[in-house]
Amino acid sequence: MSTILDRIKAYKLEEIAARKAERPLVAVEDAARAAPAPRGFARALSTAAATGYGLIAEIKKASPSKGLIREDFDVPALARAYEAGGATCLSVLTDGPSFQGADDFLRQAREAVKLPCLRKDFLYDTYQVAEARALGADCILIIMASVTDSQALELEAAASHWGMDVLVEVHSRDELARAEHLKSRLIGINNRNLDTFEVSLDVTRDLARRVPEDRLIVSESGLYTPEDLADLARYGARCFLIGESLMRQADVEAATRAILADPLTSQGGV
């Protein structure tokens, strides 16, 4: 039986083929070269994590498991609210079929703020990496559950070529071991199982202590309160990717500020 991730991969490969036919790689690369310089996604997170938390605040309209998350969806306004609330970076969904995202959302968000931006999508082809840079992305996502080791290496090399950072996402010990062969410093631990979309913070609790010390941990999904962040900070997570719990709030700026309140000091640990 196919999983949600299987279904996403199937339509995404069709989408990539259609985009390549519509817009040749050379045109995408020309746009990538003309894009504003990358803003330093990993550097911003590292700086923030040294004294508090690094927050990747996500602009997400919907998801396969929850359906529509936010009806009032003004991308520039949301980006500015996140920035004013203290977010370090932004994550912007560009996948349409499952998340009601769009490429233009990334452009709008980046133009509205000074924060580095992640293109949140399912990447399988280096064409998409050039596309991400053309859209203004400062970082891409590599989901280890969805790619082979050789694909991951190719995507990472392409990101490096364009001056972008890479957030390498894992959900299991096996995926973490594979991720360690990549050069990227950012390790995203997704508390959501992408096969079932079930969420458990135990995933970060288990994997964080196994991440090499030279990597920066980003805990993703299922984060709702300052206590959640403090809990996982004790296991070594200093950065967090939060979307749904902030997107559902009427006052996104206040909600962002509230979840970042009273960060656990870097001396905390288990």
UniProtKB/Swiss-Prot annotation:
It is an enzyme of class 4 (lyase). The keyword Lyase applies. Pathway: Amino-acid biosynthesis; L-tryptophan biosynthesis; L-tryptophan from chorismate: step 4/5. Pfam families: IGPS (PF00218). GO terms for molecular function: indole-3-glycerol-phosphate synthase activity; phosphoribosylanthranilate isomerase activity. Its EC number is 4.1.1.48. It catalyses: 1-(2-carboxyphenylamino)-1-deoxy-D-ribulose 5-phosphate + H(+) = (1S,2R)-1-C-(indol-3-yl)glycerol 3-phosphate + CO2 + H2O. GO terms for biological process: L-tryptophan biosynthetic process. Disulfide bonds: none annotated. Keywords: Amino-acid biosynthesis, Aromatic amino acid biosynthesis, Decarboxylase, Lyase, Tryptophan biosynthesis. The keyword Amino-acid biosynthesis applies. PANTHER family: INDOLE-3-GLYCEROL-PHOSPHATE SYNTHASE, TRYPTOPHAN BIOSYNTHESIS PROTEIN. Belongs to the TrpC family. HAMAP family: IGPS_B. This is Indole-3-glycerol phosphate synthase. The gene is trpC.
